[in-house]
Swiss-Prot record:
GO molecular function: manganese ion transmembrane transporter activity
Membrane topology: Multi-pass membrane protein
Taxonomic placement: Bacteria, Pseudomonadati, Pseudomonadota, Gammaproteobacteria, Enterobacterales
Name of the featured protein: Putative manganese efflux pump MntP
Gene Ontology CC: plasma membrane
Role: Probably functions as a manganese efflux pump.
NCBIfam families xref list: PRK11469.1
PANTHER family, per database record: MANGANESE EFFLUX PUMP MNTP-RELATED
Amino acid sequence: MNLSATILLAFGMSMDAFAASIGKGATLHKPKFSEAVRTGLIFGAIETLTPLVGWGLGMLASQFILEWNHWIAFILLVFLGGRMIVEGFRGDSDEACEAPHRHGFWLLVTTAFATSLDAMAVGVGLAFLQVSIVTTALAIGCATFIMSTLGMMVGRFIGPLLGKRAEILGGIVLIGIGSEILWSHFAG
């Protein structure tokens, strides 16, 4: 795979993480740049590892992985998105209830993992091609770091405009991503 194809693949794989990080940024109370970088690092690290795992699994059992990855991503994203929607509607009527200043580590890891399962499937496919899996995985991770960090900062500006509805919107985005993954599997 040539350099331009690798870069296009990397940024294509980062789009789900970008959308999810916009939703995450919108639900925080004025996230700082350091929080955006933290989120980018978590998403980027996981997005780097999943194609490597997929590549390894592709060498072993590609058919099983390809049959189930879309369902796993869909269930995780619908669960996380549903939780965000419920929290958005549950909020206190007085505005004294302030948005969090940062998301928990495991919530970010779970979201990052759910949005990176397509990269794992790509890794399975790459197992059958003559590519440098390490270079490709690093490119995907770097692109995801950049896009997730930018997504958090974009979400920072959207969040104050939406208020408590930002959490509902973030949940809808996650459910939409999960649905798109499932739809792509059955339509494609």
